A protein has these predicted regions:
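Short Gly/Pro-enriched loop/turn and capping motifs at secondary-structure junctions
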Residues: 126, 169-170, 201-203
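C-terminal lid/capping helical subdomain adjacent to the catalytic/cofactor pocket in oxidative enzymes
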Residues: 164, 174-251
Length: 251
């Protein structure tokens, strides 16, 4: 009402609750936020929001006794495992997109980092496709098979534990109606007490640091009375941050 959000409705199963408030933060997918506003949304922003695309994500966690990858760097690691946190997979013969080694983020993430390694195997897919819908055992078996085929582990490696996790809308994508995102932002900013933050809240492929920074900027605006939200939407739009720009600068 009058350019302000006055309440939100929470629906969980058969239970509905109304929450009144003075200030509202939204980190939900902006596509779903606008859809939830109903028929009051003008046609243009509704169309833009409905057309925003996403890439979904499945990660398979495996606890193994060791990796066959050798640490051939000068970087010292606990138990001399490879020092990478992430390894991007370019092998067209497998579906796996990225390997994450949790021991290298922090050994405290692993119960016994001296004798075991937790790896996360990341698969990019679409919600509802064959890989997304695969049962957990088949998914884990495929992940193990692909690691063996790449020589990351071998058929005698002990798989001590496993877990499959699906993540909806993990990657906001920059095609379809995204080229009209500025129009949608302009509409959302007509609600002076609504702050869209985070990766999905802004439909921006930000890392965790920048996603959190959008919230810091929002709180700063609220405390200072600043009305414009350009600084919130502008987090991580500086071209020099991005890897490709850094590479160009080196060249």
């Amino acid at each position: 009402a009058d350019g302000r959000v006055t309440s939100v409705k929470s629906v969980c199963g058969d239970k509905e609750e109304i929450f009144d408030g003075d200030i509202f933060f939204s980190s939900m997918p902006v596509k779903d936020l606008v859809a939830g506003m109903g028929s009051a949304v003008p046609a243009a922003p509704a169309e833009i929001a409905a057309g925003l695309p996403y890439r979904d994500f499945v990660t398979v966690g495996l606890l193994v006794d060791k990796l066959d990858l050798k640490n051939e760097t000068g970087i010292k690691t606990l138990n001399n495992i490879v020092p990478d946190c992430w390894i991007y997979v370019q092998d067209v013969g497998v579906k796996l997109g990225r390997i994450q080694i949790f021991n290298n983020w922090s050994p405290y993430l692993v119960k016994d980092p001296q004798h075991t390694v937790w790896v996360g195997l990341e698969y990019f897919c679409n919600e509802g496709d064959d890989f997304w819908s695969m049962d957990e055992k088949a998914c884990v078996d495929k992940a193990v098979s692909e690691l063996i085929s790449m020589g990351v582990i071998n058929k005698n490696t002990k798989i001590l534990d496993s877990h499959r996790e699906r993540v909806q809308k993990a990657y906001p994508a920059y095609f379809d109606t995204y080229d009209r995102m500025d129009e949608l932002v302009k509409y959302l900013d007509t609600f002076e007490n609504l702050y869209c933050v985070g990766r999905n809240g802004q439909h921006r492929y930000n890392n965790m640091d920048h996603s959190m920074a959008t919230s810091f900027e929002a709180v700063s605006n609220i405390l200072s009375g600043k009305k414009t939200k350009e600084n919130i939407w502008g987090v991580n739009t500086e071209a020099e941050y991005h890897e490709e720009a850094a590479d160009e600068k080196k060249a």
